[in-house]
């Protein structure tokens, strides 16, 4: 129960950061607290439906191991797409851009992004920052 509250608090913190803008239309979509045990239902919901063409992932605090990620679009069919994410991200490291909306339909908006993974080499929970580019 405590880890659920911690994850919920982290998601709310991530939503508060979602309006922060960077150069070149890069926006922090949110921050996810990564538990120490493998978890496959870590969800980052976008507060508003947003068209995002690609994302970057940053390990803000601690090392992270990822076993998968998917992006979900707001459509009548609830379309989703599996993402090719690196298996590990070291603290302070940022991935290259990961393309989404690759089916030539750049008008689909992202409703949520889910991750499977956990914190490694740390007694504290790592933070995964998700940066979007529209």
Curated annotation (Swiss-Prot):
Quick check: keyword Ribosomal protein in the entry?
no
For this UniProt record, the keywords arranged alphabetically read as follows: Signal
Provide the leader sequence positions.
Answer: 1-23
Which Pfam families does the entry link to? DUF2541
The UniProt record lists the keyword Cell inner membrane? no
What family is this protein classified in?
Answer: Belongs to the UPF0412 family.
Mind telling me what this protein is named? UPF0412 protein YaaI
Q: Which gene encodes it?
A: yaaI
